[in-house]
UniProtKB/Swiss-Prot annotation:
Similarity comment: family membership: Belongs to the transferase hexapeptide repeat family. LpxA subfamily.
Lipid biosynthesis recorded as keyword: yes
CDD domains cross-referenced by the UniProt entry: LbH_UDP-GlcNAc_AT (cd03351)
One Gene Ontology biological process: lipid A biosynthetic process
Protein name: Acyl-[acyl-carrier-protein]--UDP-N-acetylglucosamine O-acyltransferase
SUPFAM superfamilies (UniProt xref): Trimeric LpxA-like enzymes
Localization of this protein: Cytoplasm
Taxonomy, superkingdom: Bacteria
Catalysis: reaction(s): a (3R)-hydroxyacyl-[ACP] + UDP-N-acetyl-alpha-D-glucosamine = a UDP-3-O-[(3R)-3-hydroxyacyl]-N-acetyl-alpha-D-glucosamine + holo-[ACP]
Biological role: Involved in the biosynthesis of lipid A, a phosphorylated glycolipid that anchors the lipopolysaccharide to the outer membrane of the cell.
Record-linked Pfam families: Acetyltransf_11, Hexapep
EC number of this enzyme: 2.3.1.129
Length: 263
């Protein structure tokens, strides 16, 4: 179904079962396949491929030569019905690749809202990405990666499969992540190590001086006290009672399985 207000270039190929919302624009030579839903106000440039089952929200911008909802590159994939969901107001620049999930996980790759994906970013199968993130050119997310909110990935940075990055973390360009990165932490290097707290990012997002100070104390407990994660958890849990910002640390570390980056 195509909304009458949609603007579709005559050379675009739209499957009869695709759902195209109000005021959607689709450029030349773009192909929208079966079981694709594109929400109101989304703009799709030329030469884009969108395969289903894929649901794209409202007011997104998808630039030329991107591949959205393609089969994953997991060798175990055998054609099962899996999904991709993209939220609202994302910007997906040229040559980005977003793959659907696998039945070995939740059969779903999910992207939140208001994210910026610069040129040639790869989002592999079963990734879960929050809101308000920035991924610079050629950032690469392997399968099953979980990214929180307000994360910044530098150009050419890459993360190992099943890796996690907590909200408000900053990943430097060309960093290689083989362990989890806790919330608020800046990471750089190959393999990446921690370089303090993303204080400037927190200030820009309206965190109070007291909250930032508490996050810094939590970072020191985690990385400079000489304690194991099990030993430091009671300290962080006590801190979180007085400062909610520290609770992100606690919740993230409770789910730790792969270990966290270390100096």
């Amino acid at each position: 179904m195509i909304d009458p207000s949609a603007k579709i270039h005559p050379s675009a190929i739209i499957h009869p079962n695709a759902v195209i919302g109000a005021n959607v624009e689709i450029g030349a030579f773009t192909c929208v396949e079966d079981e694709v839903e594109i929400g109101e106000g989304t703009w799709v440039g030329s030469h884009v491929l969108i395969k289903g089952p894929t649901k794209i929200g409202r007011n997104n911008k998808i630039f030329q030569f991107s591949s959205i909802g393609e089969d994953c590159q997991d060798k175990k994939y055998a054609g099962e019905r899996t999904f991709l969901e993209i939220g609202d107001a994302n910007v997906i620049r040229e040559h980005c690749t977003f793959h659907r999930g696998t039945v070995q996980d939740q059969s779903l790759t999910k992207v939140g809202s208001r994210n910026l994906f610069m040129v040639n970013v790869h989002v592999a199968h079963d990734c879960m990405i929050g809101d308000d993130c920035i991924f610079a050119n050629n950032a690469t997310l392997a399968g099953h990666v979980h990214i929180g909110d307000w994360v910044i990935f530098g150009g050419l940075a890459a993360i190992h499969q099943f890796g996690r990055v907590g909200s408000h973390a900053f990943i430097a360009g060309m960093a290689a992540l083989n362990k989890d990165v806790p919330p608020y932490v800046m990471a750089a290097g190959h393999y990446a190590t921690p370089f303090g707290i993303n204080s400037e990012g927190l200030r820009r997002r309206g965190f109070s001086a007291e909250a930032i100070s508490a996050v810094k104390r939590a970072y020191k407990e985690l990385y400079r006290s000489g304690k194991t994660i099990d030993e430091v958890m009671p300290v962080l849990e006590t801190m979180a009672q007085d400062e909610p910002a520290v609770a992100l640390f606690v919740e993230f570390l409770k789910k730790n399985e792969r270990g966290i980056i270390r100096p």
